[in-house]
Amino acid sequence: MGKDFRYYFQHPWSRMIVAYLVIFFNFLIFAEDPVSHSQTEANVIVVGNCFSFVTNKYPRGVGWRILKVLLWLLAILTGLIAGKFLFHQRLFGQLLRLKMFREDHGSWMTMFFSTILFLFIFSHIYNTILLMDGNMGAYIITDYMGIRNESFMKLAAVGTWMGDFVTAWMVTDMMLQDKPYPDWGKSARAFWKKGNVRITLFWTVLFTLTSVVVLVITTDWISWDKLNRGFLPSDEVSRAFLASFILVFDLLIVMQDWEFPHFMGDVDVNLPGLHTPHMQFKIPFFQKIFKEEYRIHITGKWFNYGIIFLVLILDLNMWKNQIFYKPHEYGQYIGPGQKIYTVKDSESLKDLNRTKLSWEWRSNHTNPRTNKTYVEGDMFLHSRFIGASLDVKCLAFVPSLIAFVWFGFFIWFFGRFLKNEPRMENQDKTYTRMKRKSPSEHSKDMGITRENTQASVEDPLNDPSLVCIRSDFNEIVYKSSHLTSENLSSQLNESTSATEADQDPTTSKSTPTN
Protein backbone atom coordinates (compact mmCIF):
# COMPACT_ATOMS: atom_id res chain seq x y z
CA MET A 1 0.00 0.00 0.00
CA GLY A 2 1.38 3.37 -1.03
CA LYS A 3 1.70 6.07 1.60
CA ASP A 4 -1.15 8.23 0.34
CA PHE A 5 -4.06 9.81 2.20
CA ARG A 6 -5.82 6.48 2.57
CA TYR A 7 -2.71 4.90 4.08
CA TYR A 8 -2.67 7.42 6.93
CA PHE A 9 -6.47 7.73 7.21
CA GLN A 10 -6.85 3.98 7.80
CA HIS A 11 -3.58 3.52 9.71
CA PRO A 12 -3.93 1.56 12.97
CA TRP A 13 -2.90 4.57 15.06
CA SER A 14 -5.49 6.78 13.35
CA ARG A 15 -8.25 4.24 13.87
CA MET A 16 -7.41 3.61 17.52
CA ILE A 17 -7.11 7.33 18.33
CA VAL A 18 -10.55 8.02 16.85
CA ALA A 19 -12.14 5.03 18.61
CA TYR A 20 -10.82 5.94 22.06
CA LEU A 21 -11.40 9.69 21.64
CA VAL A 22 -15.10 8.96 21.17
CA ILE A 23 -15.17 7.37 24.63
CA PHE A 24 -13.52 10.43 26.19
CA PHE A 25 -15.76 12.90 24.36
CA ASN A 26 -18.92 11.05 25.38
CA PHE A 27 -17.92 11.17 29.04
CA LEU A 28 -16.99 14.85 28.70
CA ILE A 29 -20.30 15.92 27.19
CA PHE A 30 -22.20 13.87 29.77
CA ALA A 31 -20.35 15.71 32.52
CA GLU A 32 -20.79 19.17 30.94
CA ASP A 33 -24.38 18.76 29.73
CA PRO A 34 -26.80 20.49 32.15
CA VAL A 35 -29.60 18.19 30.96
CA SER A 36 -27.77 15.34 32.74
CA HIS A 37 -28.80 16.93 36.06
CA SER A 38 -32.36 17.93 35.11
CA GLN A 39 -35.20 16.62 37.27
CA THR A 40 -37.85 17.06 34.57
CA GLU A 41 -39.34 14.26 32.47
CA ALA A 42 -37.14 13.02 29.64
CA ASN A 43 -38.35 13.28 26.06
CA VAL A 44 -36.65 11.77 23.02
CA ILE A 45 -38.02 12.20 19.51
CA VAL A 46 -39.45 8.93 18.05
CA VAL A 47 -37.63 6.71 20.57
CA GLY A 48 -39.63 8.30 23.40
CA ASN A 49 -42.89 7.39 21.65
CA CYS A 50 -41.75 3.78 21.22
CA PHE A 51 -40.63 3.51 24.85
CA SER A 52 -43.85 5.01 26.21
CA PHE A 53 -45.98 2.89 23.86
CA VAL A 54 -44.49 -0.36 25.16
CA THR A 55 -43.69 0.34 28.81
CA ASN A 56 -46.10 2.85 30.36
CA LYS A 57 -49.38 4.80 30.10
CA TYR A 58 -51.52 1.67 30.19
CA PRO A 59 -55.26 2.44 30.66
CA ARG A 60 -57.15 0.90 33.56
CA GLY A 61 -59.59 -1.09 31.46
CA VAL A 62 -58.57 -4.64 30.56
CA GLY A 63 -59.81 -4.23 27.00
CA TRP A 64 -57.70 -1.13 26.45
CA ARG A 65 -54.64 -2.88 27.88
CA ILE A 66 -55.10 -5.88 25.59
CA LEU A 67 -55.60 -3.57 22.61
CA LYS A 68 -52.39 -1.69 23.39
CA VAL A 69 -50.34 -4.87 23.81
CA LEU A 70 -51.72 -6.34 20.59
CA LEU A 71 -50.93 -3.14 18.70
CA TRP A 72 -47.29 -2.94 19.78
CA LEU A 73 -46.81 -6.66 19.19
CA LEU A 74 -48.26 -6.19 15.71
CA ALA A 75 -45.97 -3.17 15.22
CA ILE A 76 -42.90 -5.26 16.12
CA LEU A 77 -43.94 -8.10 13.80
CA THR A 78 -44.69 -5.67 10.96
CA GLY A 79 -41.38 -3.90 11.53
CA LEU A 80 -39.42 -7.16 11.37
CA ILE A 81 -41.13 -8.31 8.18
CA ALA A 82 -40.96 -4.90 6.48
CA GLY A 83 -37.35 -4.45 7.55
CA LYS A 84 -36.32 -7.79 6.07
CA PHE A 85 -38.31 -7.91 2.83
CA LEU A 86 -39.17 -4.28 2.06
CA PHE A 87 -36.22 -2.21 3.28
CA HIS A 88 -33.37 -4.74 3.23
CA GLN A 89 -34.15 -6.84 0.17
CA ARG A 90 -36.16 -4.44 -2.00
CA LEU A 91 -34.79 -1.00 -1.11
CA PHE A 92 -31.17 -1.64 -0.14
CA GLY A 93 -30.61 -4.83 -2.13
CA GLN A 94 -32.52 -4.48 -5.40
CA LEU A 95 -33.25 -0.77 -5.81
CA LEU A 96 -30.08 0.81 -4.36
CA ARG A 97 -27.88 -2.27 -4.99
CA LEU A 98 -25.74 -1.65 -1.91
CA LYS A 99 -22.90 -4.15 -1.52
CA MET A 100 -22.86 -3.95 2.26
CA PHE A 101 -26.45 -5.27 2.29
CA ARG A 102 -25.86 -8.13 -0.16
CA GLU A 103 -27.55 -11.45 0.56
CA ASP A 104 -28.66 -11.23 4.22
CA HIS A 105 -25.88 -8.97 5.48
CA GLY A 106 -27.06 -6.17 7.74
CA SER A 107 -30.59 -7.50 7.89
CA TRP A 108 -30.91 -7.51 11.68
CA MET A 109 -29.83 -3.89 11.99
CA THR A 110 -32.30 -2.94 9.24
CA MET A 111 -35.06 -4.88 11.00
CA PHE A 112 -34.28 -3.16 14.30
CA PHE A 113 -34.60 0.35 12.88
CA SER A 114 -37.67 -0.68 10.90
CA THR A 115 -39.25 -1.92 14.13
CA ILE A 116 -38.65 1.47 15.76
CA LEU A 117 -40.30 3.15 12.77
CA PHE A 118 -43.41 0.97 12.92
CA LEU A 119 -43.70 1.27 16.70
CA PHE A 120 -43.75 5.04 16.16
CA ILE A 121 -46.43 4.72 13.45
CA PHE A 122 -48.59 2.34 15.47
CA SER A 123 -48.34 4.60 18.53
CA HIS A 124 -50.10 7.29 16.50
CA ILE A 125 -52.72 4.78 15.35
CA TYR A 126 -53.28 3.96 19.02
CA ASN A 127 -53.55 7.68 19.82
CA THR A 128 -56.21 8.07 17.12
CA ILE A 129 -58.26 5.27 18.70
CA LEU A 130 -57.94 6.95 22.12
CA LEU A 131 -59.07 10.29 20.71
CA MET A 132 -62.13 8.65 19.16
CA ASP A 133 -63.20 7.55 22.64
CA GLY A 134 -62.99 11.11 23.96
CA ASN A 135 -62.14 10.36 27.60
CA MET A 136 -58.67 8.85 27.23
CA GLY A 137 -56.56 11.99 26.79
CA ALA A 138 -54.39 11.12 29.79
CA TYR A 139 -53.10 8.01 28.01
CA ILE A 140 -52.05 9.68 24.75
CA ILE A 141 -48.58 8.51 23.70
CA THR A 142 -45.99 11.29 23.34
CA ASP A 143 -42.21 11.47 23.24
CA TYR A 144 -42.13 11.87 27.03
CA MET A 145 -40.75 8.66 28.52
CA GLY A 146 -42.01 8.77 32.10
CA ILE A 147 -38.52 8.93 33.63
CA ARG A 148 -36.39 11.89 34.70
CA ASN A 149 -33.77 13.37 32.41
CA GLU A 150 -31.16 12.67 35.08
CA SER A 151 -32.01 8.94 35.11
CA PHE A 152 -32.25 8.67 31.33
CA MET A 153 -28.93 10.43 30.80
CA LYS A 154 -27.25 8.08 33.26
CA LEU A 155 -28.64 5.09 31.39
CA ALA A 156 -27.53 6.67 28.11
CA ALA A 157 -24.04 7.27 29.48
CA VAL A 158 -23.69 3.63 30.55
CA GLY A 159 -25.08 2.50 27.18
CA THR A 160 -22.70 4.68 25.17
CA TRP A 161 -19.81 3.49 27.34
CA MET A 162 -20.64 -0.14 26.59
CA GLY A 163 -21.09 0.54 22.87
CA ASP A 164 -17.98 2.70 22.56
CA PHE A 165 -15.84 0.29 24.56
CA VAL A 166 -16.86 -2.74 22.48
CA THR A 167 -16.27 -0.73 19.30
CA ALA A 168 -12.85 0.49 20.43
CA TRP A 169 -11.90 -3.02 21.53
CA MET A 170 -12.92 -4.52 18.20
CA VAL A 171 -10.87 -1.89 16.38
CA THR A 172 -7.88 -2.69 18.61
CA ASP A 173 -8.46 -6.42 18.14
CA MET A 174 -8.50 -6.06 14.37
CA MET A 175 -5.36 -3.93 14.34
CA LEU A 176 -3.47 -6.54 16.37
CA GLN A 177 -4.66 -9.58 14.39
CA ASP A 178 -4.66 -8.57 10.73
CA LYS A 179 -1.72 -7.60 8.54
CA PRO A 180 -2.47 -4.78 6.06
CA TYR A 181 0.22 -2.85 7.99
CA PRO A 182 2.77 -5.64 8.66
CA ASP A 183 5.46 -3.32 10.07
CA TRP A 184 3.21 -1.85 12.75
CA GLY A 185 3.21 -3.18 16.32
CA LYS A 186 5.07 -6.44 15.76
CA SER A 187 5.82 -7.09 19.43
CA ALA A 188 2.30 -6.12 20.51
CA ARG A 189 0.82 -8.46 17.92
CA ALA A 190 3.01 -11.32 19.06
CA PHE A 191 1.84 -10.83 22.65
CA TRP A 192 -1.79 -10.40 21.59
CA LYS A 193 -1.88 -13.72 19.74
CA LYS A 194 -0.46 -15.79 22.60
CA GLY A 195 -3.01 -18.29 23.85
CA ASN A 196 -6.11 -16.66 25.29
CA VAL A 197 -4.56 -13.26 26.00
CA ARG A 198 -7.09 -11.24 23.97
CA ILE A 199 -10.03 -13.18 25.44
CA THR A 200 -8.85 -12.81 29.04
CA LEU A 201 -8.02 -9.13 28.66
CA PHE A 202 -11.41 -8.30 27.14
CA TRP A 203 -13.52 -9.80 29.91
CA THR A 204 -11.21 -8.57 32.66
CA VAL A 205 -11.10 -4.99 31.38
CA LEU A 206 -14.81 -4.94 30.52
CA PHE A 207 -15.92 -6.17 33.94
CA THR A 208 -13.50 -3.94 35.87
CA LEU A 209 -14.04 -0.70 33.97
CA THR A 210 -17.80 -1.17 33.60
CA SER A 211 -18.11 -1.69 37.35
CA VAL A 212 -16.22 1.55 37.96
CA VAL A 213 -18.21 3.46 35.31
CA VAL A 214 -21.58 2.29 36.63
CA LEU A 215 -20.54 3.06 40.22
CA VAL A 216 -19.34 6.58 39.38
CA ILE A 217 -22.32 7.47 37.17
CA THR A 218 -25.15 6.05 39.26
CA THR A 219 -23.93 7.14 42.69
CA ASP A 220 -22.50 10.57 41.76
CA TRP A 221 -19.43 9.45 43.68
CA ILE A 222 -17.33 11.87 41.63
CA SER A 223 -18.78 15.32 40.95
CA TRP A 224 -17.44 16.81 37.73
CA ASP A 225 -18.18 20.37 38.85
CA LYS A 226 -16.24 19.88 42.07
CA LEU A 227 -13.44 18.14 40.21
CA ASN A 228 -12.76 20.69 37.47
CA ARG A 229 -13.75 23.74 39.59
CA GLY A 230 -14.89 25.76 36.62
CA PHE A 231 -11.81 25.17 34.47
CA LEU A 232 -12.77 26.11 30.89
CA PRO A 233 -16.53 26.02 31.51
CA SER A 234 -18.63 25.13 28.48
CA ASP A 235 -21.60 26.98 27.01
CA GLU A 236 -24.36 25.74 24.71
CA VAL A 237 -22.34 26.56 21.56
CA SER A 238 -19.20 24.66 22.59
CA ARG A 239 -21.32 21.74 23.80
CA ALA A 240 -23.15 21.68 20.44
CA PHE A 241 -19.84 21.55 18.57
CA LEU A 242 -18.62 18.77 20.89
CA ALA A 243 -21.77 16.73 20.21
CA SER A 244 -21.33 17.35 16.48
CA PHE A 245 -17.74 16.09 16.50
CA ILE A 246 -18.86 12.97 18.38
CA LEU A 247 -21.20 12.26 15.47
CA VAL A 248 -18.32 12.83 13.05
CA PHE A 249 -16.10 10.40 14.95
CA ASP A 250 -18.87 7.77 14.99
CA LEU A 251 -18.98 7.91 11.19
CA LEU A 252 -15.18 8.00 10.93
CA ILE A 253 -14.95 4.68 12.77
CA VAL A 254 -17.01 3.07 10.01
CA MET A 255 -15.29 4.97 7.16
CA GLN A 256 -11.83 3.97 8.41
CA ASP A 257 -12.63 0.29 8.00
CA TRP A 258 -10.33 -1.36 5.46
CA GLU A 259 -13.36 -2.77 3.61
CA PHE A 260 -15.48 0.40 3.56
CA PRO A 261 -17.82 1.06 1.76
CA HIS A 262 -18.51 -2.41 0.32
CA PHE A 263 -17.46 -4.68 3.25
CA MET A 264 -16.70 -7.53 0.82
CA GLY A 265 -13.10 -8.29 1.75
CA ASP A 266 -11.68 -11.46 3.26
CA VAL A 267 -11.07 -10.01 6.74
CA ASP A 268 -13.04 -11.74 9.50
CA VAL A 269 -13.44 -9.63 12.63
CA ASN A 270 -13.57 -11.82 15.71
CA LEU A 271 -16.29 -10.93 18.16
CA PRO A 272 -14.89 -9.32 21.32
CA GLY A 273 -14.04 -11.87 23.97
CA LEU A 274 -14.62 -14.81 21.62
CA HIS A 275 -12.58 -16.95 19.22
CA THR A 276 -15.18 -16.83 16.47
CA PRO A 277 -15.96 -14.08 13.94
CA HIS A 278 -19.69 -14.77 14.06
CA MET A 279 -22.51 -16.02 16.28
CA GLN A 280 -25.13 -18.58 15.25
CA PHE A 281 -28.38 -19.40 17.00
CA LYS A 282 -30.31 -22.46 15.91
CA ILE A 283 -34.10 -22.17 15.71
CA PRO A 284 -35.17 -25.84 15.97
CA PHE A 285 -38.95 -25.40 16.01
CA PHE A 286 -38.90 -23.98 12.48
CA GLN A 287 -37.94 -27.45 11.23
CA LYS A 288 -41.55 -28.52 11.77
CA ILE A 289 -42.72 -25.81 9.39
CA PHE A 290 -39.89 -25.60 6.87
CA LYS A 291 -37.82 -28.37 5.30
CA GLU A 292 -34.58 -26.51 5.90
CA GLU A 293 -32.59 -25.73 9.02
CA TYR A 294 -32.67 -22.04 9.94
CA ARG A 295 -30.11 -20.23 12.02
CA ILE A 296 -29.65 -16.63 13.15
CA HIS A 297 -26.17 -15.63 11.99
CA ILE A 298 -24.49 -12.40 13.15
CA THR A 299 -21.01 -11.54 11.89
CA GLY A 300 -18.48 -9.65 13.96
CA LYS A 301 -18.40 -6.71 11.54
CA TRP A 302 -22.15 -6.09 11.63
CA PHE A 303 -22.19 -6.70 15.37
CA ASN A 304 -19.62 -3.93 15.69
CA TYR A 305 -21.17 -1.38 13.37
CA GLY A 306 -24.69 -2.18 14.50
CA ILE A 307 -23.63 -1.06 17.97
CA ILE A 308 -22.17 2.14 16.53
CA PHE A 309 -25.47 3.06 14.89
CA LEU A 310 -27.30 2.42 18.16
CA VAL A 311 -24.87 4.75 19.92
CA LEU A 312 -25.43 7.21 17.07
CA ILE A 313 -29.09 7.52 18.13
CA LEU A 314 -28.06 8.56 21.64
CA ASP A 315 -25.47 10.97 20.26
CA LEU A 316 -28.06 12.56 17.96
CA ASN A 317 -30.32 13.07 20.96
CA MET A 318 -27.41 14.68 22.81
CA TRP A 319 -26.82 17.03 19.89
CA LYS A 320 -30.54 17.90 19.81
CA ASN A 321 -30.42 18.78 23.51
CA GLN A 322 -27.58 21.25 22.97
CA ILE A 323 -29.08 22.96 19.91
CA PHE A 324 -32.56 23.50 21.34
CA TYR A 325 -31.63 23.83 25.00
CA LYS A 326 -33.68 26.33 27.04
CA PRO A 327 -33.04 26.29 30.80
CA HIS A 328 -36.64 26.74 31.98
CA GLU A 329 -37.83 23.72 29.94
CA TYR A 330 -35.50 21.52 31.99
CA GLY A 331 -36.26 23.01 35.40
CA GLN A 332 -33.13 25.16 35.39
CA TYR A 333 -32.32 28.87 35.49
CA ILE A 334 -29.40 31.25 35.00
CA GLY A 335 -27.56 32.85 37.90
CA PRO A 336 -24.67 35.32 38.18
CA GLY A 337 -21.90 34.80 35.63
CA GLN A 338 -24.35 33.03 33.30
CA LYS A 339 -23.97 29.89 35.42
CA ILE A 340 -26.73 27.27 35.35
CA TYR A 341 -28.66 26.22 38.45
CA THR A 342 -30.76 23.04 38.59
CA VAL A 343 -33.97 23.08 40.62
CA LYS A 344 -34.46 20.01 42.79
CA ASP A 345 -37.59 21.18 44.60
CA SER A 346 -40.47 19.11 43.23
CA GLU A 347 -43.05 21.79 44.03
CA SER A 348 -41.29 24.31 41.81
CA LEU A 349 -41.15 21.81 38.95
CA LYS A 350 -44.86 21.05 38.81
CA ASP A 351 -45.82 23.79 36.38
CA LEU A 352 -42.34 25.07 35.35
CA ASN A 353 -43.40 28.61 36.22
CA ARG A 354 -40.77 30.88 34.66
CA THR A 355 -41.23 33.43 37.45
CA LYS A 356 -40.25 30.89 40.08
CA LEU A 357 -37.50 29.51 37.85
CA SER A 358 -35.35 32.63 38.09
CA TRP A 359 -32.42 33.78 40.18
CA GLU A 360 -34.28 36.84 41.41
CA TRP A 361 -37.25 34.93 42.78
CA ARG A 362 -35.36 31.95 44.22
CA SER A 363 -32.69 34.06 45.93
CA ASN A 364 -35.30 36.30 47.63
CA HIS A 365 -37.81 33.68 48.78
CA THR A 366 -37.48 31.17 51.58
CA ASN A 367 -38.45 27.53 51.39
CA PRO A 368 -40.71 26.88 54.43
CA ARG A 369 -39.55 23.27 54.63
CA THR A 370 -35.87 24.11 55.09
CA ASN A 371 -36.09 27.73 56.25
CA LYS A 372 -33.45 28.58 53.63
CA THR A 373 -33.65 30.41 50.34
CA TYR A 374 -34.59 28.26 47.38
CA VAL A 375 -31.20 28.93 45.77
CA GLU A 376 -29.43 27.17 48.63
CA GLY A 377 -31.31 23.97 47.82
CA ASP A 378 -30.57 24.11 44.10
CA MET A 379 -27.61 22.48 42.34
CA PHE A 380 -24.93 24.84 41.04
CA LEU A 381 -23.23 23.97 37.75
CA HIS A 382 -20.17 25.53 36.18
CA SER A 383 -21.73 25.03 32.74
CA ARG A 384 -22.96 28.29 31.25
CA PHE A 385 -25.85 29.49 29.11
CA ILE A 386 -25.01 32.60 27.08
CA GLY A 387 -28.26 32.82 25.12
CA ALA A 388 -26.70 32.24 21.69
CA SER A 389 -29.08 32.39 18.74
CA LEU A 390 -30.29 29.24 17.01
CA ASP A 391 -28.41 30.23 13.84
CA VAL A 392 -25.10 30.24 15.69
CA LYS A 393 -25.79 26.91 17.38
CA CYS A 394 -26.83 25.31 14.09
CA LEU A 395 -23.35 26.06 12.73
CA ALA A 396 -22.23 23.20 14.96
CA PHE A 397 -24.05 20.77 12.69
CA VAL A 398 -21.89 21.72 9.69
CA PRO A 399 -19.07 19.22 10.55
CA SER A 400 -21.64 16.44 11.02
CA LEU A 401 -23.40 17.39 7.79
CA ILE A 402 -20.12 17.22 5.87
CA ALA A 403 -19.36 13.80 7.41
CA PHE A 404 -22.82 12.46 6.50
CA VAL A 405 -22.44 13.76 2.92
CA TRP A 406 -19.03 12.10 2.52
CA PHE A 407 -20.37 8.91 4.08
CA GLY A 408 -23.23 8.81 1.58
CA PHE A 409 -20.94 9.81 -1.31
CA PHE A 410 -18.56 6.90 -0.80
CA ILE A 411 -21.39 4.40 -0.38
CA TRP A 412 -23.25 5.65 -3.46
CA PHE A 413 -20.29 5.73 -5.84
CA PHE A 414 -18.06 2.95 -4.48
CA GLY A 415 -20.36 0.69 -2.47
CA ARG A 416 -22.95 -0.33 -5.07
CA PHE A 417 -23.19 -3.18 -7.53
CA LEU A 418 -23.30 -2.24 -11.19
CA LYS A 419 -26.56 -3.06 -12.92
CA ASN A 420 -25.03 -6.01 -14.77
CA GLU A 421 -22.70 -7.10 -11.97
CA PRO A 422 -23.58 -10.46 -10.36
CA ARG A 423 -24.67 -9.99 -6.76
CA MET A 424 -23.33 -13.06 -5.05
CA GLU A 425 -21.88 -13.91 -1.67
CA ASN A 426 -18.27 -12.99 -1.02
CA GLN A 427 -16.22 -15.31 -3.22
CA ASP A 428 -13.27 -15.25 -0.87
CA LYS A 429 -15.14 -17.38 1.67
CA THR A 430 -16.22 -21.00 1.73
CA TYR A 431 -19.83 -21.59 2.54
CA THR A 432 -22.27 -24.49 2.68
CA ARG A 433 -25.93 -24.54 1.76
CA MET A 434 -27.46 -27.81 2.93
CA LYS A 435 -30.97 -28.93 2.10
CA ARG A 436 -32.29 -31.24 4.83
CA LYS A 437 -34.75 -34.06 4.20
CA SER A 438 -36.87 -35.83 6.76
CA PRO A 439 -36.49 -39.62 7.21
CA SER A 440 -39.93 -40.15 5.66
CA GLU A 441 -38.82 -38.31 2.54
CA HIS A 442 -35.69 -40.43 2.27
CA SER A 443 -37.74 -43.63 2.55
CA LYS A 444 -39.67 -42.55 -0.51
CA ASP A 445 -36.59 -41.90 -2.63
CA MET A 446 -36.65 -45.27 -4.44
CA GLY A 447 -34.27 -47.05 -2.15
CA ILE A 448 -31.43 -44.57 -2.28
CA THR A 449 -28.64 -45.61 0.10
CA ARG A 450 -25.14 -44.42 0.90
CA GLU A 451 -23.75 -47.26 -1.21
CA ASN A 452 -25.48 -46.17 -4.43
CA THR A 453 -25.32 -42.43 -3.84
CA GLN A 454 -23.82 -40.53 -6.75
CA ALA A 455 -22.10 -37.18 -6.53
CA SER A 456 -21.39 -34.71 -9.30
CA VAL A 457 -18.98 -31.81 -9.39
CA GLU A 458 -20.10 -28.62 -11.14
CA ASP A 459 -18.82 -25.11 -11.73
CA PRO A 460 -21.36 -22.82 -9.97
CA LEU A 461 -22.08 -19.42 -11.44
CA ASN A 462 -19.23 -19.94 -13.94
CA ASP A 463 -16.77 -19.05 -11.21
CA PRO A 464 -13.55 -21.12 -11.28
CA SER A 465 -12.82 -20.29 -7.63
CA LEU A 466 -15.88 -22.28 -6.45
CA VAL A 467 -16.76 -25.96 -6.86
CA CYS A 468 -20.30 -27.29 -6.38
CA ILE A 469 -20.73 -30.88 -5.18
CA ARG A 470 -24.23 -32.30 -5.66
CA SER A 471 -25.45 -35.59 -4.23
CA ASP A 472 -28.78 -37.16 -3.45
CA PHE A 473 -28.61 -35.84 0.09
CA ASN A 474 -27.12 -32.39 0.00
CA GLU A 475 -25.58 -29.62 -2.02
CA ILE A 476 -22.23 -28.16 -1.00
CA VAL A 477 -20.36 -25.21 -2.47
CA TYR A 478 -16.63 -25.17 -1.70
CA LYS A 479 -13.82 -22.86 -2.46
CA SER A 480 -11.81 -24.95 -4.91
CA SER A 481 -8.58 -24.57 -2.96
CA HIS A 482 -10.25 -26.16 0.10
CA LEU A 483 -11.62 -29.24 -1.69
CA THR A 484 -9.90 -32.52 -0.79
CA SER A 485 -10.87 -36.16 -0.97
CA GLU A 486 -11.28 -36.18 2.81
CA ASN A 487 -13.75 -33.29 2.59
CA LEU A 488 -15.80 -35.09 -0.06
CA SER A 489 -15.78 -38.38 1.83
CA SER A 490 -16.79 -36.82 5.14
CA GLN A 491 -19.71 -34.99 3.55
CA LEU A 492 -21.06 -38.03 1.71
CA ASN A 493 -20.80 -40.19 4.85
CA GLU A 494 -22.61 -37.68 7.03
CA SER A 495 -26.04 -38.72 8.31
CA THR A 496 -28.96 -36.79 6.88
CA SER A 497 -30.05 -35.81 10.37
CA ALA A 498 -26.60 -34.71 11.50
CA THR A 499 -25.52 -31.15 11.97
CA GLU A 500 -24.00 -28.94 9.25
CA ALA A 501 -20.73 -29.65 7.42
CA ASP A 502 -17.55 -29.48 9.42
CA GLN A 503 -15.48 -27.32 7.10
CA ASP A 504 -14.20 -23.92 8.21
CA PRO A 505 -15.61 -21.44 7.56
CA THR A 506 -18.74 -23.21 6.23
CA THR A 507 -22.17 -22.39 7.63
CA SER A 508 -25.66 -23.77 7.18
CA LYS A 509 -28.22 -21.80 5.25
CA SER A 510 -28.98 -18.85 7.47
CA THR A 511 -31.87 -16.48 7.37
CA PRO A 512 -31.29 -13.68 8.08
CA THR A 513 -27.53 -13.02 8.36
CA ASN A 514 -25.80 -9.91 9.63
Swiss-Prot record:
Q: Which residues form the signal peptide?
A: none
Q: Which residues lie on this side of the membrane: Cytoplasmic?
A: 1-15, 87-110, 176-198, 261-295, 416-514
Q: Which residues cross the membrane?
A: 16-36, 66-86, 111-131, 155-175, 199-219, 240-260, 296-316, 395-415
Q: Provide the topology term for how it sits in the membrane.
A: Multi-pass membrane protein
Q: Which domain of life is it from?
A: Eukaryota
Renumbered to this chain, the Basic and acidic residues biased-composition regions fall at 438-448
Any Pfam family the entry gives: TMEM117
Provide the protein's localization: Cell membrane
Q: Which UniProt keywords apply?
A: Cell membrane, Glycoprotein, Membrane, Phosphoprotein, Transmembrane, Transmembrane helix
| One Gene Ontology biological process | intrinsic apoptotic signaling pathway in response to endoplasmic reticulum stress
- List residues, modification Phosphothreonine: 453
Q: What is its main location?
A: membrane
Q: Which family does it belong to?
A: Belongs to the TMEM117 family.
Its function, per the record, reads: Involved in endoplasmic reticulum (ER) stress-induced cell death pathway.
Q: Which PANTHER family match?
A: TRANSMEMBRANE PROTEIN 117
Q: What is this protein called?
A: Transmembrane protein 117
Q: Which organism is it from?
A: Homo sapiens (Human)
Gene it is expressed from: TMEM117
